[in-house]
């Protein structure tokens, strides 16, 4: 796992209070990890702060899984 993936996983565990073993790449924040819409907004804000990236609302709406978040952040950091 990349540093970005590890950091995303850590943020998800801290913000949602879920067991780390449940935070898999295909895990949906809402369906699998029990997040609600406010949780997802807070996660996006935490990702923005942790990685010094800006995630516009239209992009944030497409981030539904752990892998979506990792892929988006990796793409932004590479740009």
UniProtKB/Swiss-Prot annotation:
Q: Which residues carry this modification: O-(pantetheine 4'-phosphoryl)serine?
A: 37
* GO CC annotation: cytosol; membrane
Q: Where in the cell is it found?
A: Cytoplasm
Q: Which UniProt keywords apply?
A: Cytoplasm, Fatty acid biosynthesis, Fatty acid metabolism, Lipid biosynthesis, Lipid metabolism, Phosphopantetheine, Phosphoprotein
Tell me how the protein is altered or processed after translation.
4'-phosphopantetheine is transferred from CoA to a specific serine of apo-ACP by AcpS. This modification is essential for activity because fatty acids are bound in thioester linkage to the sulfhydryl of the prosthetic group.
Give the principal location in a single coarse category: cytoplasm
Is DNA-binding a UniProt keyword of this protein? no
Instruction: Copy the pathway line from the protein's UniProt record.
Output: Lipid metabolism; fatty acid biosynthesis
Give the highest taxon in the source lineage.
Answer: Bacteria
Q: Which GO terms describe its biological process?
A: lipid A biosynthetic process
GO-annotated molecular function: acyl binding; acyl carrier activity
Q: Where is the Carrier domain?
A: 2-77
Q: Report the function annotation for this chain.
A: Carrier of the growing fatty acid chain in fatty acid biosynthesis.
Q: Which PANTHER family match?
A: ACYL CARRIER PROTEIN, CARRIER DOMAIN-CONTAINING PROTEIN
Family per record: Belongs to the acyl carrier protein (ACP) family.
Q: What name appears for this protein in its UniProt entry?
A: Acyl carrier protein
Organism per entry: Gluconobacter oxydans (strain 621H) (Gluconobacter suboxydans)
